[in-house]
């Protein structure tokens, strides 16, 4: 059985192709990495790396052992996690991909509380993801609508419903619209996520109305910018009712709902996690998400 620290040193050298970069990544002296690599090569009776200019390249033996080093390290991590779960210890790292419009306000609070509860856990949070990226496999994806990526299970967290909002400043000089058909007479702030050839709005008493695509000087896919533009009196625009209520709580007197009772079709908020059994840290975080769902998402 190979020394795990030596295998980690070799793996880092494979990844970074440089003794200096690998030492920096592992936060170890270069002399330590060199010594561990030399010991590993002596134990295996094979040269694993060779220098070409300023870069390190794998020998034939190194290419073979690199495959097994990945497996050794993965197995070591899994065994460590299994032992820690015996004591309900949450360690390691969670890699999350989260839609930018879900981070502010809601997820940031969930993450903060979760990390305070589990002081040794590391979080890597990204707001960009493409299905075509086959190498990158996050532990959890939280997204607005979206089909489940290959190899992931979908769980619906809730729904957003969009409604039209204006600011008191804007309505001080204009009549407040009472029906969606009147929106065509107002400057429109277009939220790209809701832009269609036409947008179906629904009312519990008056049925449906198809709002045509409206010309807009400002188009944005960022909720914070959308809300700011509306609050500044630039026109009328759509916001998720949950987000608008939170914005109004934080900035009283900023937003007023227009055409009361008219809302868009529900938009799904989903999380996606890999098939199979999950480590304790992911299971607990998914539970935390379920418990933190706002009532307005139901």
Curated annotation (Swiss-Prot):
Entry-linked Pfam families: HTH_1, LysR_substrate
DNA-binding region(s), residue ranges: 19-38
HTH lysR-type domain residues: 1-59
GO biological process: DNA-templated transcription
Keywords of this entry: Activator, DNA-binding, Transcription, Transcription regulation, Virulence
Molecular function, one GO term: sequence-specific DNA binding
Signal peptide start-end: none
Keyword DNA-binding (UniProt): yes
Free-text function comment from the UniProt entry: Transcription activation of the irgA gene. In the presence of sufficient iron, transcription of both irgA and irgB is negatively regulated by a fur-like protein. In low iron conditions, negative regulation of transcription is removed, and production of irgB leads to positive transcriptional activation of irgA.
Family indicated by similarity: Belongs to the LysR transcriptional regulatory family.
Official protein name in the record: Iron-regulated virulence regulatory protein IrgB
């Amino acid at each position: 059985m190979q020394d795990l620290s030596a295998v980690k040193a070799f793996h880092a050298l494979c990844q970074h192709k440089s003794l200096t970069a690998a030492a920096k990544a592992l936060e170890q002296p270069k002399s330590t990495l060199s010594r561990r690599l030399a010991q590993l090569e002596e134990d295996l009776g094979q040269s694993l790396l060779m220098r070409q200019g300023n870069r390190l390249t794998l020998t034939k033996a190194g290419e073979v052992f690199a495959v097994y080093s990945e497996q050794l390290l993965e197995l070591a991590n899994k065994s460590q996690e299994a032992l820690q779960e015996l004591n309900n210890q949450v360690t390691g790292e969670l890699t999350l991909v989260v839609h930018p419009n879900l981070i502010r306000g809601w997820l940031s609070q969930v993450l903060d509380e979760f990390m305070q509860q589990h002081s040794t856990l590391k979080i890597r949070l990204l707001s960009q993801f493409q299905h075509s990226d086959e190498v990158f496999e996050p532990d959890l994806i939280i997204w607005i609508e979206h089909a489940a990526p290959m190899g992931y299970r979908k769980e619906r967290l809730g729904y957003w419903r969009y409604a039209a909002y204006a600011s008191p400043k804007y309505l001080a000089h204009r009549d407040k619209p009472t029906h969606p058909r009147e929106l065509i007479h107002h400057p429109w702030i277009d939220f790209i996520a809701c832009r269609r050839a036409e947008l179906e709005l629904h009312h519990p008493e008056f049925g449906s109305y198809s709002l045509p695509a409206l010309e807009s000087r400002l188009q944005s896919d960022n909720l914070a910018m959308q809300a700011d533009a509306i609050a500044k009196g630039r026109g009328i625009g759509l916001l998720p009712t949950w987000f608008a209520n939170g914005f109004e709580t934080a900035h009283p007197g900023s937003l007023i709902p227009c055409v009361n009772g008219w809302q868009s079709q529900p938009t799904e908020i989903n999380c996606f996690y890999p098939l199979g059994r999950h480590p304790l840290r992911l299971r607990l975080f998914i539970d935390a998400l379920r418990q933190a769902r706002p009532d307005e998402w139901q």
